[in-house]
Each structure stands twice: as C-alpha cells, then as structure tokens.
UniProtKB/Swiss-Prot annotation:
GO terms for molecular function: ATP binding; protein serine kinase activity; protein serine/threonine kinase activity. This is Actin-fragmin kinase. Keywords: ATP-binding, Cytoplasm, Kelch repeat, Kinase, Nucleotide-binding, Repeat, Serine/threonine-protein kinase, Transferase. It comes from Physarum polycephalum. It comes from the Eukaryota. Belongs to the protein kinase superfamily. AFK protein kinase family.
Length: 737
C-alpha cells in the first residue's frame, strides 16, 4: 500500500547545482545574528510538563548542514500554492521549506496535536537572519534562478521547515483503495482530529460543527499504516456569543445521550467522504469516528484547566521570545472555553437530546452513495455560469431600492432530481428547466422541469440529439428555445458545441453555425449574455491554467459566430464572472483566474457594444467574494431615463466555505449591498416574518446553484453545494420587505 499511497506530482528531486551568492542582493540588510540552540527531541510525558523556553522545536528534524552539498539527495523548487516552496531530500527524510503567513497558529496547533496524542509533521521554525536561515537561503537560491520563491522566503522573519509526510490526501482515495485504508483505526483517528478542529475552530477539514463542504486536501493518510496526519492547521478564535459553542454542546449532548447510534452530524461527514472517494464507510465507519471524537473529548475533559492554561501561556511566551511570533490574544481564551464545554458535557451532562436519526435531523437529503463505477476524479471546482434568460417583466414596484426580503423553503412532495451543482437553470412560462450538472462526482445530461404552481418535478421527455453529459455550461432562452453552449465532461474536457431545446416541440437539435466566422475555443464557466438577437460569450476557462478574456458574439438570425476585436481596458483572463446587459453595454464583475485559478477578482468592467471597447469602473459597498463563480440574475425596471437595473446574487464561496448572503449590484450607481433576508414562518408560505436566528442554517450557504427571477419579484434558487450536494428550492420574495 505504501507505494500506491505516496503520490508526488512530478519527479521532485534534481541534482543540486553549485550554490550562488546571487541571493545576497535579494536578502534584507543583515541583522545581528541570534544564537540558536540545538533542538531536542520532545516526547510528551504522561504529566504534561514541558520546558519549551529554549526554542519552539518540539520535533526532532535533525541538523541539516546547508553548506554540505553532499548530504542532499535532491532539492526541487515548486510554485504550487500562493507563495511557492522547496522540497529538500536528505538521508533522514524529505522536508518542505516554505513561507507561512500562519506560522504561529500552525506551530501552536501542532503542539496541541502532540498534547492530544495526534500525529503531526515534524516542524522547526527557522529565523531567516540566523546562521541556519542565512545558509539555508543561500543554498536554495542556487536552484531558484527566477528568485521568485527565494525572494519571498528571504523577506520573511521566520521560515517553516516541515517534514514531508509520505502518503495521500483523503480526497485522493478511490473506491479501490478506500476499503483498504479507511479501517476502524483510521476512522477513529479522523474522529479525534475533528475534536481538535472543534477546539481551534478549524473548519477547513471535516466540518463536523460547521456548514461548509470542508477540505479533505488538509488530511493526509501516511503510508505508515494509514496514520491520519493533519496539515495546514490554524486557530480561528471566536467571540463567546458566537453559535459555534452551542452547536458543539448540542453535538456532544446527542453523542453522549445515544452511544452507538449514528448521529446526523457524523452521517453528513460520512456523506462527504462518500462524495470524494466513491466509497461509503457505512454506519460502522460513522460510529468509529464518533468513538474517536468522544475519546479525545473525554481526554480533554480530564485536564486540569488551570495547569493547561499555564502550559498554553508558556508556548505563547516561547514563540514570542525565540521568534517574535504572537498568536491572537483571543486564541488561548477561546481554546479554554471550548475545553470547558468538553468538561461540562462529560461531567455535567444535560438532559437527553432527541434521537439522532440522520433522516429527521436535516431538511437536506443525503446523496446516494457513489457506486464502484464512479469516477475517482473530482469535478472542476469552478462553478457554472448563471441563468442568462431575458429579464422578466417588472413587478409593480422597483426592486432596486429593496433593503430586506423574505425567504421561504419550497416543500416538494414528489421525487426530486439528484442533488447537483454547476447545472443550468432557466425560467420559461412559469417553469424552471434544469439541465445537466454534477451529481456527486458524475456529470449528467438529465433534464428536469419544475412547475411552481403545482410544486412538482417532472422529467422532460425530449426527442433529437441531446447534449452530452456536462457541467459549467451556459443556458439562454431566445425565440422559444433554450440554447446550451460549452461546459466540460467528467474528465474536464471542455466543449464548444451549441445545442437548442425547442420548448413547444420538446426536441433537441445540435446547431452547426456557418463556417464564415471563427468558432469560440472550448470553455466552461464563461458568461453568456443575451442582447437583442445576439448572444455574447465572454471569458471562461479551458483548463485550470488557461483562462480567456475574449468576446464572441453569436447572431441567431445569421447562425454565425464572430470574434470581436475588443480594445481598451480589457479585463484579465478569467472565469466565473457575472456579466449582464445594461444600456447596450455588457457590465461584468468578478471571476477568478491566474495560475491554477487561485486569483480572485473584485473589479468591474463595461464593454461598450457599439465601439467594442472595455473600460474599468469603480464599485462601492460590500462586494461578494468570488473564489468560486457567482450565480446571479439581472433585473430591470422602467424605461428611458427612469430605467433602473440591478443584479441579484446569492451565495458563492470564499474558497474555503460556502456563503449564504444575498447581494445586489446597482447598475446605475455601481454600488453593492447585502439584502437582509427574513424567514417565513411556514414552508411554502410567506406569512408573517421573524428574524433568522443566529446560526440558522437555512437557507443553506451554497455555491454552484442556478438562479432565476420571475415577473412577481421572486428569486428562486435550486441545488448547489453546501456541506453536501443540495436538491432543494429556496425562494426570496423581494416584495415582502
């Protein structure tokens, strides 16, 4: 298993060239050298009394003589991530040299891991102006001819030297390898790790106490017996009034009151693992995670909190003394507050909680576990384009000035489409038509219609050549037809084909435009905007390292594509942006691109159709975050000089967690604002309204959903992805304010 687990993206290690002194010109001015004491091996004794005053070097990486080139088996520079890093191989192992903007928090979390008996990578903090730091930088400069990575390191006061854990991240497991790796012991370790994450409020792994999708990239399964090793840990302290503490209390009440029963929270974690690996660990796997979680909780509940607080303060003092690093002043009080919750749950249990039946605990249906034939490759993380149907007729009053709205959850009695994201959705004659998207890990080409009047889903029975399974495509309504363009398949192969669905005839047709004009290159998560009898395609991604900023127009009457010669302040290549028509121009905002798609944009541009010219405009207010594309819908009211326009957008993601706010962008003033959403008293009704309680999970934060707006001022969203893939319909009534 070890050989199968250790995955490195390329051959990491090359022969080390001779060192260069060129780094000296890129280093900060020399500072007085601080003598560094040799780190000693740290083994946590039963009675936790450790003197860390010498250095925060609690793991023994061993000495690395950066001047002795003979000891290196290889060194390789990588620009993966936002700052880049180096891999260094010696006889004693492989290590990572990197910058960490979170170095004090990461170091503190590793100390907590050791205290709780969890495995953590060996780590040492190296001062860049120390003798070791200077020698390290000069050595690494020899292979970094561009100086891009080494300059970043040299400008940091401290550098992180970390052991490379040989293994595989949890999200890379497949249906073949998962049964061998996800043993009872592994599941118990995952439970213990979740307890640690609850203590430090780290939602970026398995989100047992949060509503996001988590990040299985931050859980490594070591080749040494599938040992669970956390990576990229952090502490995010919260105020005492935050609902995180109450959610943890409720979770503990449920687990303690119903031992041996699968809780809804751990059932959701089980679903997330199924989603990524295609393998269902079953009820036994969930219960094993619960056992590991409670074992760590009980261990923490046995701590002498006064003594433990002194230990935490000594760690903090050591970080400050040795490396001038300071964790947040709220971190230690927050950790102690969480430990008191653990202590109270074990020693002063509350009355029993209701039965933890997964099926009754959440309004969200759990996805069907993937079969063994499910692809092991996850779909693209870039969400699909929004609905681009023509704007509906205006309601009796303008919605541009609305500050509040009511939301309601639509209860559907009959069978629903499978949960999905990155699908398309258009509104036609009062019905929502949903095509394609990713269902768990598989792109689909199924086609559903939802009748809002009857509250009923139906499969659309159609004739003709339907589009192949895809996600990230665009859908536009024109001339009694839905027009599908682009997208990508399971293997992230992008498309540039064009299909229509005739609503009256219920027929599909593949469109073959005339060859006179240039055809758009394959792409997904582009924007498709209807202006008169033309469809404008802007941007999109061809793959994670290739983004576009070109503008194509498809003229329906001529059945012809044209590449426009756009000039002016052209936006950077991007995907996932919102683009709408306003006064015969295209207004576009946001998106992301850059190497690997990690650059998020919060800029706005106007493309004047008459002159094919871009210019940038300034926006004000509270912007939506755009690490994942936004689902949006345009709205127009009035005519002539009194015409108003806005864009409504719900959800999205900051790259780590799905979001749950409703935004409005005023196209006249370029101002963004958040619209306060109020909850309906009953499902399917508006009724009287009450404020959403703090921590309320509905409407569930999400991304990758579709959004439509009807002529009465009601916005409807379907599906998307939160902590799980979703299959619900949520509505926002903009007239109930």
């Amino acid at each position: 298993m070890a050989g199968a687990l250790w995955e490195i993206e390329k051959e990491l290690f090359t022969k080390l060239p001779a060192p260069s002194s060129a780094i000296n010109s890129h280093l900060q001015p020399a500072k007085p050298k601080v003598p560094q004491k040799k780190p000693s091996k740290w083994d946590p004794p039963a009675e936790f009394k450790v003197d860390l005053s010498t250095a925060v070097s609690y793991n023994d990486i061993g000495d690395i003589n950066w001047k002795n080139l003979q000891q290196f088996k290889g060194i390789e520079r990588s620009e993966k991530g936002t700052e880049g890093l180096f891999f260094v191989e010696t006889e004693s192992g492989v290590f990572i040299v990197k910058r960490s903007t979170n170095i004090e928090s990461e170091t503190f979390c590793s100390l907590l891991c050791m205290r709780l008996g969890l495995h953590a990578p060996k780590v040492r903090v190296v001062s860049s102006n120390s003798e070791e730091g200077t020698n390290m930088l000069e050595c690494l400069a020899a292979i970094d001819k561009s100086f891009r990575v080494i300059t970043t390191l040299a400008n940091q006061a401290n550098i992180l030297l970390m052991e490379l854990v040989r293994g595989i991240t949890l999200n890379k497991l497949t249906t073949t390898s998962a049964p061998e790796v996800l043993t009872k012991s592994t599941m118990q370790q995952l439970g213990s790790l979740m307890a640690l994450d609850v203590i430090v409020n780290n939602s970026d792994r398995l989100p047992i106490a949060w509503t996001n999708e988590g990040n299985l990239d931050n859980i490594m399964l070591s080749e040494r017996g599938a040992t669970v090793v956390p990576i990229d840990s952090k502490i995010i302290p919260l105020d005492a009034s935050h609902p995180h503490g109450e959610r943890v209390r409720e979770l503990l009440r449920t687990l303690i009151a119903h031992p041996g029963h699968e809780s809804s929270q751990f059932h959701s974690i089980r679903d997330i693992i199924t989603l990524y690996t295609g393998y269902d660990v079953g009820t036994e796997g969930s219960i094993s995670m619960q056992e590991g979680f409670l074992a760590t909780v009980r261990e923490c509940a046995s701590f002498d909190l006064d003594a433990f607080e002194r230990e935490l303060l000594s760690w903090q003092e050591s970080l400050q003394k040795c490396h001038n690093l300071s964790i947040s002043p709220q971190a230690i009080p927050f950790i102690l507050r969480m430990l008191r919750i653990f202590h109270d749950a074990i020693h002063n249990p509350s009355p029993s909680s209701p039965s933890p039946s997964p099926s009754s605990s959440s309004s969200t249906s759990h996805p069907t576990p993937a079969s063994s034939s499910t692809s092991s490759t996850l779909p693209s993380s870039i969400p699909s384009s929004s609905n681009t149907s023509p704007p509906p007729a205006s309601s009796s009053e303008s919605l541009v000035g609305v500050e509040e709205c009511a939301w309601l959850k639509v209860v559907v009695p009959n069978e629903k489409p499978a949960p999905r994201r990155y699908h398309s959705g258009v509104l036609y004659e009062g019905k929502l038509y949903v095509f394609g998207g990713v269902c768990i890990k598989t792109a689909s080409n199924d086609f559903y219609v939802f009748d809002f009047a009857k509250k009923k889903w139906s499969i659309v029975v159609a004739q003709g050549e339907a589009p192949s399974p895809r996600c990230g495509h665009s859908a536009t309504v024109y001339g009694g037809k839905m027009w599908i363009f682009g997208g990508h398949n399971n293997n992230k192969q992008p498309y540039s084909d064009l299909y229509t669905f005739d609503f009256a005839k219920s027929t599909w047709e593949k469109i073959e435009p005339t060859k006179d004009g240039p055809w758009p290159s394959p792409r997904y998560h582009h924007s498709a905007t209807l202006v008169g009898a033309s469809l404008y395609i802007f941007g999109g991604a061809e793959h994670k390292s290739k983004y576009h900023n070109d503008v194509y127009v498809y003229k329906f009457d001529a059945n012809q594509w044209e590449l426009l010669n756009a000039t002016g302040e052209t936006p950077e290549p991007r995907a996932g942006q919102m683009t709408v028509e306003w006064n015969n121009s295209l207004f576009t905002f946001g998106g992301h691109g850059g190497e690997g798609g990690y650059t998020s944009f919060v800029d706005a541009h106007v493309f004047e159709i008459a002159t094919n010219t871009f210019h940038e405009v300034d926006c004000s207010g509270t912007f939506p975050r755009t690490a994942r594309p936004l689902s949006y819908v345009p709205y127009y009211y009035g005519s002539g000089d009194k015409r108003e326009g806005a864009v409504f957008s719900f959800g999205g993601s900051d790259g780590k967690s799905p979001l749950g706010s409703l935004y409005q962008w005023n196209l006249k003033t370029h101002k963004w604002k958040i619209i306060k959403a109020w909850m309906a008293v009953e499902d399917n009704t508006i009724g009287s309204m009450a404020a959403i309680a703090s921590g309320k999970l509905d409407p569930i934060p999400r991304y990758g959903h579709c959004t439509v707006l009807d002529d009465t001022g009601v916005i409807s969203i379907f599906g998307g992805s939160g902590s799980l893939f979703l299959d619900d319909i949520v509505q926002f009534d903009m007239t109930e304010s």
